[in-house]
Amino acid sequence: MELQLAIDLLNKEDAAELANKVKDYVDIVEIGTPIIYNEGLPAVKHMADNISNVKVLADMKIIDAADYEVSQAIKFGADVITILGVAEDASIKAAIEEAHKNNKQLLVDMIAVQDLEKRAKELDEMGADYIAVHTGYDLQAEGQSPLESLRTVKSVIKNSKVAVAGGIKPDTIKDIVAESPDLVIVGGGIANADDPVEAAKQCRAAIEGK
């Protein structure tokens, strides 16, 4: 089981500083969509240039022109790139092909997908590296969690890894870990903690069953 830190609300310098503080406890560091909107792909490059032994994910949330956008993210140092599960099949297939051609990985974000079971099966057959169930920020505000979606997707896929995101914190991560996802994505639960290093350490301990 892997742990990913999602960083959304910092500039690229502060994001790299935070990532380096917690890198002993995480497997993947994400440059979140808000940072990419604010600073562009150079934020991904800054992270890639300033951290080692950790994969860098660019949360592009691609919807179209997929092979080009994947190629650009890779050019700027991304190891993993995200595309939306609601994108056209042709876009997702092109994104997977471009990523794999460069020995990189593609994560498909299931945010806003209505028929999770059907789409997860399709994406699994297409060869997505990760399928991520994601309770977005706006739905978290309504008290929703990704647990049920995680169970649904995990029950139908055969090859892809299952990732889970959405409001996960050190005090709730054990419920998620109990469902045995392949990748747990924690954002503010680490980034906004009073002590991010301690929060990351607690999350790592939880996924290692300690």
From Swiss-Prot:
Gene Ontology molecular-function annotations: 3-dehydro-L-gulonate-6-phosphate decarboxylase activity; hexulose-6-phosphate synthase activity; orotidine-5'-phosphate decarboxylase activity
Reaction(s) this enzyme catalyzes, per UniProt: D-ribulose 5-phosphate + formaldehyde = D-arabino-hex-3-ulose 6-phosphate
Keyword Cytoplasm attached: no
Enzyme class, spelled out: lyase
Pathway: One-carbon metabolism; formaldehyde assimilation via RuMP pathway; D-fructose 6-phosphate from D-ribulose 5-phosphate and formaldehyde: step 1/2
SMART domains cross-referenced by the UniProt entry: OMPdecase (SM00934)
Family the entry assigns: Belongs to the HPS/KGPDC family. HPS subfamily.
Name of the featured protein: 3-hexulose-6-phosphate synthase
The organism of origin for this protein: Staphylococcus aureus (strain USA300)
